[in-house]
Each structure stands twice: as structure tokens, then as C-alpha cells.
């Protein structure tokens, strides 16, 4: 588990069946085999320690769902964060390191006190969970939505200078893809509502619930339904 507060950055390159993260990684603390590290928001396990970094195996599923492959091929910069300790401060939000999909940068605008980052995403797979002031992880960075379209196809973030200059956002351009992880609570809430027949089936590639896994949904979540439930 992680917080979305990036500790440092490193360079990514291919290594056998995985990736090699290189750079000045002292900010991550002492590393050991088996440690979990968030690499651009992707939870990877240290499988080998080298002089200037570490190596990690990466499954085909992870390569297909995330942006690690093109970044490794191009030696790109990645955000790095060590796993959360129970004694640590939770300064961002709970991030699992399990990427839900990718979003495309549609616009970057410099503003007096921040950068406005506009991102497009799949409204059915990720956008359905978005709302103003919700938490989201972009390339492993804990951020807050400043707003989003009603259909969930586009959202925007106000990025403060400290976050901009200490993460890979400073290198990103319009058209680049970002790893997206939706807030855990949003996904679990939908799953629980579906189990009680109060929401449409969650977008998942896993097995459908059986007879004991919940009844068929009576209606999708809507503003009218939420009002009837006391929200």
C-alpha cells in the first residue's frame, strides 16, 4: 500500500522479463529483495539489487495495462515511492499500486499559482467513479480532481508547483499517457452496492457473482436514487 506522495524519480529501462530502475534512490531508504516499490503508480517487487538501482519482474498483464513498456523502451523518467509503513503519516490517500487503466493528457495550462492538467479517460472503466474533489492517482501521484465532465470522459487537476517540480509531470506533454488508479473507496462502494442489488454491475474482467454474490441490480446509481437513500 502507498500514499501517492512521490519520494524521488528514476530512469526506467528494459531488463529481461522486467524493468531496471536506475538513479539516486537514497530517498527510498534501504532496499531489500522482496520490497514493494511504486514505479509510476505500479506496485513492483524488487527481485534484484544493483549498484545504481533495482530490477523487477513485470507480468504481461501489467505491461498491457500500464505505460511501463514504452517508458522502459525510451529510458523515461518514473515516479518512485516505497511501501507505506503503519507508523507513517498518510499525507496523500490510500493507493494500492494496481493501475485501473490509462488516461491521455489533453491539455496543460500554466496558471498564476498552479498548472491545470486536463486528462481524458474511458467513461465506463474509470470515468464512472469520478467526481469533483475526489482523489485519484496519476502515475503514482496523489491528486485531487478540480472538476470533471458529467459523462466522466474528461477531468482536470490543479497541480501546485511543489508537486510539479518533484514529479515526472514536469516532463509530460499533451498526448502522453498516464497510469490511472481510481480511489479505492469508490470501487469498493460500487461493489457493495451491486451485491445488494442497488447498482449496475461493476466494470471488471473477473468472474461474475454467483447466486450468493448478490441479486440483479434494480437500477443504476443516479442523483435521484441517492436522494431516496438519504444522500
Give the location of each predicted region:
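Conserved loop->alpha-helix
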Residues: 1-231
